[in-house]
Amino acid sequence: MCKIKENFIHLFFMREIRKERSLIMSKKLVAFFSASGTTKKAAEMIAEAAKADLFEIEPKIPYTNADLDWMDKKSRSSVEMSYKKYRPEMIEKEMDMSTYDEIILGFPIWWYVAPTIINTFLEAYDFSGKKIVLFATSGGSGFGNTVKELQLSAPDAVITEGRLLNGANKQKISEWVKSL
């Protein structure tokens, strides 16, 4: 009886040690694009809660308020979003994605999808075999076809819809990160 109990305790502790090792070895990256600063605030809280590295996706030409005027069909964002194959240039940054197991990717929702600069980011690096969890901020629309459209830019990654984080506080973000 004691030998069975000893084996059970040994197996239990070995399983717990493996869990801890996988958590330690699992490296996360929070990558984000933020035109107005709202998504950036959420990304910083997520990175802190997840103990993850932070990577800002920056356009070579920053967006102005006029560029973001979705009511103007000739504004930069309206034009970009009407042509799905458009890829805005981003500031190039050296980044070895092979060091990350999980990418938490954030952006504002534009026209029910991610801004096309997110496609630029996904096509610029190799995300083969990576888990990509999305988060977004939005003035009213949800994820829509976001996962489907982004999957085309990273076909060998596993992309999942995460959460809309409109007005989320540190506690809510921390709870969400723990659930990942």
Question: Language-model segments: which ranges?
Answer:
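A structural micro-motif
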Residues: 50-52, 130, 157
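Short, glycine-/small-residue-rich phosphate/pyrophosphate-handling segment
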Residues: 133-169
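Acidic catalytic loop of the alpha/beta-hydrolase fold
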Residues: 111-112, 140
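Glycine-rich, N-terminal phosphate-binding loop of Rossmann-like dinucleotide-binding domains
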Residues: 107-108
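Short, conserved loop/helix-junction motifs that constitute active-site signature segments
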Residues: 97-98, 123-129, 153-154
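N-terminal beta1-alpha1-beta2 submodule of the flavodoxin-like/Rossmannoid cofactor-binding fold
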Residues: 10, 15-102, 112-114, 119, ...
